[in-house]
C-alpha cells in the first residue's frame, strides 16, 4: 500500500486517487466513563480534559470496470487527570471494497473491521469492543433532466460484534440495509436550490448466545433543502424484539439539522435529536453504546478553513436521557477545539 501512496504523491495514473486526513485537538468531557448521573453504578460522573488525535487514509482505483478502495483510520484519547486514565482508548478501523461498475450501477464486496483498546478499568466501566462485517452492496444512480436524480443502495452483510468485557453482550448475525433517495433541482442550473429526499430501512437478526435472540428493525426518512443554507429534517423509528426479558424496546428519533456560512469563511452546523424511548422498566443502556445512537443530542460546530488544507474548528455536544425513557438519568457534555488537515488527489 505504501508503494501505491508513492505513486499517488509523485506521479500516478489518473485512475488512482487517495486522501489523507489528520486531526489533533484538546477536549473537555464531563462524563468520560459514561455513567448514570444518579450514581446507580456506584460512581458519579467526573469530568476531565483530554487530548485526542486521528489519522486516516484511503486509496482508490477506478478502472473501466473494476473498482477498488482501501481505507485505514486510527484514533485515540488520552485523559489528563489520573482519575480518568482508565478511559484512555486507542481505536483502529480498516475497510476494503472491491467491485465492478455495470452501466450506472456498482456491485461491491465489502469488509469492515473495528477494534477498540481501552486501558485497564473495572469491568463495569469498560466499553471496548471489536466488530467485523463482510458482505455485498449494490448501488445505482440515475440522472434525470434538469439536474434531478434518483439513487438507491442495497447492502447485505454478516456481522460479528464482540463486547470484550462481557461475552453475553456479543452477537453475530445478518443485517440488511436499503435506501432510496432522490434530488429535485429548482431554479438556475448552477445557482438553484436542491431538495434531497430519502427513505431507509434496516433489519438485523442478532444471536447473542444459546438463550437470547433479538430482531432489530429501523425505518426512517429525511428531507433536505440546500440553498443559501442547509436545512434537514429527519425521523427514524426503531424496534428491538428480544427473547430476553427487559431487552425489548421501541424508540422514535426526530432530528433537525441546520448549516450555514457566515462572513469570514466560518461554517456553522447545528443539530438536535430526540431519543423518545419506550420500554419495560429496568432496561439498561450499556455504557459501551455510542451516545449519538442512544441518547438525545444537541450539537454546535464551528469550522474555519485555513490555507493548504488546514482547518480549525470548535464543537460542543450534549447528550441527555429524557424522563420518559424509563432509564437511569444521564448527562454528558463535551467541548472540543480541533486542528485538522485534509489532502486529496
Where are these regions (language model features)?
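Gram-negative and organellar
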Residues: 13-345
